[in-house]
């Protein structure tokens, strides 16, 4: 499931001609949303150094919980802290 860093996974999805970014979405921590999670299609984001962008809005990478392919396969997931 977790192959490479988050930035590597997103860069591959965005720039590898064998991948179609329209087939992927990210799930971010979004307080106030149902379950405090929000899905965002990868095609809507632009990658930055410490943040990704949706239009003019900057969102830090640490808010990404998982990256999912449209078929439901999780390709990257944030490690959870042990309680």
UniProtKB/Swiss-Prot annotation:
Family statement drawn from the similarity comment of this UniProt entry: Belongs to the UPF0248 family.
Originating species: Thermococcus gammatolerans (strain DSM 15229 / JCM 11827 / EJ3)
InterPro entries the record matches: MJ1316 (IPR040459), UPF0248 (IPR007547)
Alphabetical list of Pfam families matching this protein: MJ1316 (PF04457)
Domain of life: Archaea
Entries under HAMAP family matching the protein: UPF0248
Protein name: UPF0248 protein TGAM_1209
